[in-house]
Amino acid sequence: MIKQLSIVCPNTGGLPIAYGVCEALRAHQVYWAEQDTDSSPMRFRQFVDPTPGERVLLVDDILRSGRRLRELQELVKSKGAEIVGLAVAVFQPNPSVLNFAPLPVFYLAKMEASYYKDASSCDLCTKGVPVVKIWN
């Protein structure tokens, strides 16, 4: 058991992954950060947050830009906890992915994706292949 380690995640897709990681590592606790709206800042529930000096692993379901994990990182730092790394189920970096060095980033799968500035630079678009939106 890693009693000195706790897991911190956003309350969206990262929560099921966080509980699995907590169980696998036999970590102490899972904390999750919430947002009232997409534009509001992340926060912990009252009296349920990491303590100063507590070692935590940030966990989420997918890492693309890193924006949500960066916001979570800043929230955890503001509480005085020590971040030991990041863990995600899927690492699918986009061209503007944030750098979390020197923290290690652990992932189960890495997906390469093609990103284009506009339709004229996309081979499939120029061939007339229709665009299908799969998430918002």
Give the ranges of each region predicted by the language model.
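Short glycine-rich phosphate-binding loop at a beta-alpha junction
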Residues: M1-N11
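A structural micro-motif
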Residues: L5, A27-Q29, E54, A81, ...
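Short, glycine/charge-rich flexible loops or terminal/linker lids adjacent to PRPP-binding catalytic cores
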Residues: L15-L57, R64-R67
